[in-house]
Swiss-Prot record:
Coiled coil: none
PANTHER family xref list: RIBONUCLEASE Y
Entries under InterPro entries matching the protein: HD/PDEase_dom, HD_domain, HDIG_dom, KH_dom, KH_dom_type_1, KH_dom_type_1_sf, Ribonuclease_Y, RNase_Y_N
Location of this chain's protein in the cell: Cell membrane
Enzyme Commission number, as recorded: 3.1.-.-
Species lineage: Bacteria, Pseudomonadati, Thermodesulfobacteriota, Syntrophobacteria, Syntrophobacterales
Bilayer-crossing regions: 4-24
Organism: Syntrophobacter fumaroxidans (strain DSM 10017 / MPOB)
Keyword RNA-binding in record: yes
Membrane topology per record: Single-pass membrane protein
Name used for this protein in its record: Ribonuclease Y
Domain KH: 210-270
Amino acid sequence: MGYVSGILLVLIGLLAGVGLGVLLRQYWLEKRNRQLQEQARNILTDARKEAETIKKEAILQAKDSLFQMKAEFERETKESRKEFQNLEKRILQKEENLDKKSEALDKREGVIGKREKVLQQQEKELEENTRELHMLIEEQRKKLESLSGISAQQAKEMLARAIENEARHDAALMVKKIETEARETADRKAKNIISLAIQRYAGDYVAEKTVSVVNLPNEEMKGRIIGREGRNIRAIEASTGVDLIIDDTPEAVILSGFNPVRREVARVSLERLISDGRIHPARIEEIVEKVNIEIENAIKESGEQAAFDVGVHGIHPELIKLLGKLKYRTSYAQNVLQHSREVAFLCGIMAAELGINEKQAKRAGLLHDIGKAIDHEMEGPHATLGADLTRRYGEAPPIIHAIAAHHEDVPAEDVLAILVQAADALSGARPGARKELLETYVKRLEDLERIAGSFPGINKAYAIQAGRELRIIVESGQVNDADVVLLSRDIAKKIEGELTYPGQIKVTVIRETRAVEYAK
């Protein structure tokens, strides 16, 4: 019984505890709910206040913007009204001016109408006077024909011939005067530019010969070079493409060939074979192959070095190789690569003085003789070949034209072509730059004197200054002072058309009048 009572008490205590807990939880929940409702009301109140504030600010901003827009609109309206008023004033002024001009035009029309009537009357009178004048002229012409015994047509022809002769004389005098003035000015400026170019460029130069002789240590070496039954000499000629001539010349053999590069390969190969001592077909082919590679590399290096020295970049590799080949080519004993380098420097200096593209001038000068690298392989003038080459490898049109025109195969169309012509002549004409064979030199002198003697009125002609000047003495009775200018020009043009020569030739025509009287 006591045990049951204890359990009941425990259960009652538990139930009482649970009930008390439920009541306490209910109380806490209600309190928490009231707190949350209070927070919600506070948040709602704050939000309403903030919304009211934002609304007021927006209204104020809208009013302010409206006020500014209204003020801007009023200002623009005033400006537009003012512009319209000014425009209206200008229109009124123009209308007044137009009215005045209209009145002036009406007055002018009246005056012009009166003048037109007067002119018509004068025109009628002029026609009548012209008819009368023609009649008088016809009468006078008939009288003159009857008195002079010649017709009007014959008189016209005589007058025309007289006027033509007088015009020729005046034209010759005028040409002489203009040429004298132009030459004085041009010579002065050209001399300044050329002298400056020569002063600024002072390149060293040694005249080269087309050497094709290989020295031997002794006469026995000739037999070794020939080989058994001539097999060595045949191997050398087959490998190099050059003729090997062995004659009575002591301790020397001669290499003959049109291609200067092949001749250089043969010379170097033969010298190495002689130095090595082993001369047989297999060794010859081996040495020639090695020398070919070395010469090709040397050619490329020479072309690159020339372009670098001049300061020209971006040249096509094939043009560089052809440029290097010019090292083994000579013209009148002048090395063509050195000549091209010299022309490039002179072109650049003169271009700088004239204010044109200096780099383009140097490029044209360096490449102007590029055609000489292949003129022994292809037919045609080297200037034309060079122009075709540079066109093929993408050079600029002014460069191509300057190359084509540097020997006047085509007319020069720009200053660059003239510069290349001048620099080419300057490089080739300076003393010691070029040499020529005695036979060629003598024939050129004879041709100069022959050309001068082919013109009428020539008394004597002398080629002097090593063929760089042609001095001509004319008959004073057949050639007058005015004709001397035209004669010198005609002779110079004929020389240009018929002869080939380095540099330029000065043509001097001398006319002398002597009056002799004896005192008795």
